[in-house]
């Protein structure tokens, strides 16, 4: 009942941002973006939107995966595909609001790519690397505010946990084993086996710990999901703990 109440609140709030009748600006502000000046860009955008009295939310999101081109700004405007701009500074940010959000000039010189297929602007799927990607775990990264649970739930978040709580723990482990899911570390250890070992360990009290620095030393490979979509991690831990 509590989840359904949360879901009924979250979905309309997310749909407000998906509303195609107004512009929405997203700013990548994970560690990679902040190191390149994303917080200053975020503030410049908010100041310009406020100065011009525009109904245009400016939202802080996580890492889209193109760290080499930070700071990234995504603008969704009616009549245009969602457009991602790279290496944005405060001057460019103000220009994007003036010329594109308020006007009709997409500012092609700053465009990195479109987030959807269209006939106007090359999309990310045309990139040699991105064309082969199908994001699953990282699908929300760079598209939602990681600090807003409504954004996560509005995109189907915690639905898997709700389903899992209606199953027996043994049944969940069986499903994970059948899926072939493996850990994200270098060993690729089967997740279902790991859960089964933990479940069979002696003692009633058990602990589930998140290793926030998995992978190659110093690479911080799990940064993206920790910063950009933490509720995905929390949902997985809740299912594993159950």
Question: Predicted regions: what is each one?
Answer:
Residues 1-242:
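Feature of Fe-S/electron-transfer and energy-metabolism proteins
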